[in-house]
Structures are given as structure tokens and as C-alpha cells.
Amino acid sequence: MTAPARRLCHIAFHVPAGQPLARDLHRVFGFQPLAVREAGGWRQLALRSGDAVFLVNEGTGPQEPLYSLDPHHSVPSATNLCFDVEDVDGAARALAARGCIMPVPPTRVRDAQGTATYTVLSSPAGNLSLTLLQRAGYRGSFLPGFRPLPCTPGPGWVSHVDHLTLACTSGSSPMLMRWFHDCLGFHHLPLSPGEDPEMGLKVAAGSGRGGLRLTALQTPPNNTVPTLVLAESLPGLNSKQDQVEQFLTRHGGPGLQHVGLYTPNIIDASEGMAKAGCRLLTPPEAYYQQPGKEEQILAAGHKPGLLERQGILLDGDKDEFLLQVFTKSLFAEDTFFLELIQRQGATGFGQNNIRALWQSVQEEAARAQGA
């Protein structure tokens, strides 16, 4: 590995001036403003919930936004992942030797609280760039160059980022897996016993409807980097685009499709967000009528009717369960959504839940087209 990622620092978004993402993250999802920077046509606002930090880069300017890159993308998008590394200068030299493109060379930023060094790396995943950051000893609330904002306790719905899902073009997962392994130290995480890293996990959506190929990657256990999931479409007999293909079309290529946010209490979190205006996906009606589903929900210690009313999916067996709920797109262009996830011993991603999500998104798309 060339520049092993040790921790996810933040996820950055690029949106036009006036786009309400920052407002929604605060009012709807319970993220609290952390720090702000306004310079050169950019307004950069960092928001935090637990250990999850989102950086919203709003506007445009003659220079790059600090700690990020202007992707000059035509639609709002999650455009950057920032990782903590031990040695930015050494990482940049090693990555350049591998032929990687570094649009922003190692740059030092100082303020009264200390120093941070960063570089920005282009990735082979569409408009997604990667920031490598070294800030050991920095004493501020966020990063040099940002003005800290008054700290206000939030609802605590989200504790950290559980996983990141990239929507990829068909057949590109093996190449992306090798790139993230060689450059950042990610390695294959099997989602099923005996899984072939080159093939990933195939999840069929139903007869003739294609499905998904998922490949999960993780860093060594001593690092605090979320699981990275590569998702690509499997062709079906139906000629209609599925949601991965629709994302690629609307987004203009591969990119970060959704972020899984861990919540210690998915019932309270989803209820609170819904009351604040969050639009949650509705699972297929048949999901909760599956044979054994009620018993499974009861075995996990939950009430079937409550999960159904809030659209929460549950999968697992024995003492290992996974609960998930998904938002509708945060952007009108349908290029990004969020997931809430609570784990009761489960470490993977339930195949039944994946199928249910697949069907939910397809049904939502059909309703939107008919509106």
C-alpha cells in the first residue's frame, strides 16, 4: 500500500450557492454546525453529528476550496473523501511515483491552533477526489483556516459513518478494488462465505430484473475507516434502467451514491428525522408479509407494526440483526441519499434488505415518472 488511510476525517459535497443541503443536514438530520470559512466565492460549512463530519462547499471561485477540489460538476454531488494519513509528503511522493494525479500538491495551512498539511488525489471513480490530511497536534475544533462556531448539543441521532457506497460502471469493480488496495490500503471484505474478490456478491432483484454486484473493502482493524462498498448493475431482461444506471446517467458518471450513517437507536432517529421533514423510502408492502418476518422482528426485540410504519428493514438470524432505513434523494437531481443503520451483532449487509431497497427505489422511480 502507498498511503494507508487511518481514519475518515470528513465527507465533502459540492453544491451551487443557495442549495439547501447544509440547512437540511442541520434541521432535518441533526448535524450541528462546527466551523465555517468564507473566501474567494466559496462558503464552506462543516457540520458534525458524533464522529460523522460533512463539509458542504457551496458556490464557486477562481481557486480551489480549502482541503478539497472544485470538480466543476454539473449537478450537486458528494465529491470528496478526506482521510487521515501519517505522512502527507511521503504519501504524495509515493502516489506520484505510481502515476497518480495530484491536482493539489502538499499544502500547509496554519492558524493559532496549529498546522495541517494536505494533498488532493484524483480517483478513478468519476468526480470523486480524495484528500490526504495530516493534522497531528492541531488543537482547533475542525481545521486551520476555518472559524469555529458555537457548539450546540444535537439530538445524537448519528454516531459515525458506517459505510460509503460508490456507484460504478459495469465491470469496473475489480479495477477500483485494486486501486484502493494499492493506493490507500483497503482490502477485500467478503460479504458471503467463499466470495471471489473479482466477482463480489451478486444480489438478484428478481426474475428478469437484473440486480447488483457488491464488493466491500475495508482497512486494517486498528484503523477507523468506514467500509467502502462498490456497487454495479447486473443486466436484466427488462430494458428499463435500474437505480445504479439511473445514478450514472443523472450524475454524469460514477460517484458516491450514498453514505450509511450509524445510529444507536434507529427507531428514535428515523422518527425524529421524519418529524423534521425527512422523506424516507417506503419498502415494498410484501416485505413485512414475508413468511417468518414477524417472528424475526420479534426475535430481534422489536415490534413489527412499528418497523413497518417507519419503513425500517430488518435482516439477520440468531443473535445477529441489521436494521436499515433509507432516505429519498437529498438533491432534486437524484444523485445522493442517506441510510440509517443499526447493528445488533451483524457485521455485513443483509441480502434481503438489499433486495427490498432495490425494489423500493425502483417503485419510487416508477411513481415519480407517473407523476
UniProtKB/Swiss-Prot annotation:
Binding-site positions, Fe cation: H163, H258, E339
Cofactor note (record): Binds 1 Fe cation per subunit.
Alphabetical UniProt keywords: Dioxygenase, Iron, Metal-binding, Mitochondrion, Oxidoreductase, Repeat
Record-level Gene Ontology MF annotations: 4-hydroxymandelate synthase activity; 4-hydroxyphenylpyruvate dioxygenase activity; metal ion binding
Family to which this protein belongs: Belongs to the 4HPPD family.
Residue ranges constituting the VOC domain according to the UniProt record: 7-135, 160-328
GO biological process terms held by the UniProt record: aromatic amino acid metabolic process
Reaction equation(s) it catalyzes: 3-(4-hydroxyphenyl)pyruvate + O2 = (S)-4-hydroxymandelate + CO2
Localization per record: Mitochondrion
Keyword Oxidoreductase: yes
Main location class: mitochondrion
Cofactor annotation: Fe cation
Record protein name field: 4-hydroxyphenylpyruvate dioxygenase-like protein
Coiled coil regions in record: none
Organism phylogeny: Eukaryota, Metazoa, Chordata, Craniata, Vertebrata
GO CC list: mitochondrion
Enzyme Commission number(s) of this protein: 1.13.11.46
Disulfide cross-links: none
Record organism: Mus musculus (Mouse)
Known role: Iron-dependent dioxygenase that catalyzes the conversion of 4-hydroxyphenylpyruvate (4-HPPA) to 4-hydroxymandelate (4-HMA) in the mitochondria, one of the steps in the biosynthesis of coenzyme Q10 from tyrosine.
UniProt superkingdom: Eukaryota
